[in-house]
């Protein structure tokens, strides 16, 4: 049987043949490189100063030597405002010293991928101070960039909560930036120039950075508080006395060897040094689970439920104002900020960790307490503010009448001094407010009268 093809059919076949021949002769495009696996991290530790890593170091040793995890580190500052136990180097010179100390300490545990944000060391306890001096937006941009570069499964960082303890504002700022980056790094609209492909990656003067959005799976926090009961049941804990099967020594010993590189920050006296090391490394490493986007339990291992690979971006709630009515009294400053921050980042459980507290912020036994008088009515109000203090405490400005405009908030800065006789005790400070002859509310602050931190 002979099949006759029409002229049109023969033309189609001829065109197809010619196109196929031309297609076969086209050059292949160069492969599109995947993200650089040299910098892929399992854990990204985000802290403030060289030597901050020591609090998590026993756990990091376990993760590195037993679980073969790759760890990268971001420091917010070089620690240029700290003291120097071994030399006269200060300010920028001390920062240069501490950078080398920090890199050597981490290298002793096999951690080589280390970045510094160039924030100034800012001794204090108010997180808003550090965020201001670091340049909040620019620092966040850098952290998001490094999360996208390292693509960590888990982020470890300082607890973004105001606590009685060292309570360093730089520590808190590191925790804030890490949390914000956790929520933004997977969003291609956040710092979009970072995820734009370069026009010609082998040429100069490109403006697209060629990174990929990346959503970490978990974020855990650790704290510089001087008491630990509020951390119980909030996340996994790791004994520092456990012996590493691969190294034959305790994880505390591995951390101590690393920490010995930070000589500028350690006591020169051997007895004092041992006491200092024991103070920090005798306790277990306690984590608070911030957020998990994979299945697992609060107390489960850090990597419980984590499997390698990208996951979709999960948006946080973002800021939503809470409708309020009438007149109210609340703590201001960092306490006010954290109330909004926790809600915006789906961290409502952090508000339940502990009631408002602080420790004396200087050798003069003083404490600073910011207060806010809110007027959410349509008329101006006269508000009387009084304090209820333990015996012997002194306060400025003391009882006073405040005129608060309609739909306005009046910030009050209370400064108090505790008597020497109450050292090493917990005390309670209360403020009450009334308007139109009626009480409108009160706030209470627990204060540890035991100087153990930087000035407020």
Question: Which residues does each PLM region occupy?
Answer:
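Terminal connector regions
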Residues: 420-455
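Short, surface-exposed loop/turn segments at beta-strand-coil junctions that are enriched for proline
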Residues: 403-405, 417-423
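Short strand-edge motifs at loop-to-beta-strand transitions and within beta-strands
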Residues: 400, 408-414
């Amino acid at each position: 049987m002979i099949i006759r093809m029409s002229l049109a059919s023969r033309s189609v076949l001829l065109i197809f043949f010619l196109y196929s021949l031309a297609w076969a002769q086209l050059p292949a495009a160069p492969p599109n490189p995947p993200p650089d696996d040299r910098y892929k991290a399992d854990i990204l530790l985000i802290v403030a100063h060289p030597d901050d890593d020591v609090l998590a170091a026993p756990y990091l040793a376990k993760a590195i030597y037993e679980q073969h995890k790759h760890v990268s580190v971001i420091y917010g500052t070089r620690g240029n405002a700290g003291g120097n136990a071994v030399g006269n180097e200060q300010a920028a010179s001390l920062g240069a010293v501490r950078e080398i100390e920090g890199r050597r300490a981490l290298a002793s545990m096999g951690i080589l991928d280390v970045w510094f944000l160039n924030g100034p060391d800012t001794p204090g306890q108010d997180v808003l101070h550090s965020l201001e001096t670091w340049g909040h937006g620019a620092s966040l941009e850098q952290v998001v960039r490094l999360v996208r570069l390292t693509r960590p499964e888990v982020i470890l960082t300082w607890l973004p909560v105001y606590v009685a303890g060292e309570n360093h504002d730089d520590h808190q700022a590191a925790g804030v930036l890490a949390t914000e980056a956790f929520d933004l790094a997977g969003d291609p609209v956040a710092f979009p120039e970072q995820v734009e492909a370069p026009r010609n990656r082998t040429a100069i003067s490109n403006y697209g950075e060629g990174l990929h959005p990346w959503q970490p799976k978990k974020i855990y926090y650790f704290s510089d508080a001087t008491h630990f009961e509020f951390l119980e049941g909030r996340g996994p804990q790791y004994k520092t006395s456990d012996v590493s099967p691969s190294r034959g020594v305790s994880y505390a010993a591995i951390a101590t060897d690393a920490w010995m590189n930070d000589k500028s920050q350690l006591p020169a006296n051997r007895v004092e040094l041992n006491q200092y090391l024991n103070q920090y490394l005798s306790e277990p490493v306690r984590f608070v689970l911030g957020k998990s986007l994979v299945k697992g339990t609060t107390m489960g291992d850090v990597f419980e439920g984590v499997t390698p690979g990208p996951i979709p971006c999960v948006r946080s709630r973002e800021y939503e104002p809470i409708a309020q009515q009438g007149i109210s009294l609340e703590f201001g400053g960092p306490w006010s900020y954290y109330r909004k921050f926790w809600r915006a980042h789906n961290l409502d459980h952090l508000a339940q960790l502990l009631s408002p507290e602080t420790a004396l912020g200087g050798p003069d036994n003083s404490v600073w307490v910011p207060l806010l008088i809110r007027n959410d009515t349509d008329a101006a109000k006269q508000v009387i503010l009084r304090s209820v203090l333990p015996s012997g405490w002194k306060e400025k400005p003391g009882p006073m009448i405040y005129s608060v405009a309609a739909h306005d908030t009046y910030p009050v800065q209370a400064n108090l001094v505790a008597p020497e006789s109450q050292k090493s005790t917990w005390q309670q400070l209360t403020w009450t407010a009334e308007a139109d002859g009626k009480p409108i509310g009160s706030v209470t602050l627990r204060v540890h009268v035991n100087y153990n931190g930087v000035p407020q």
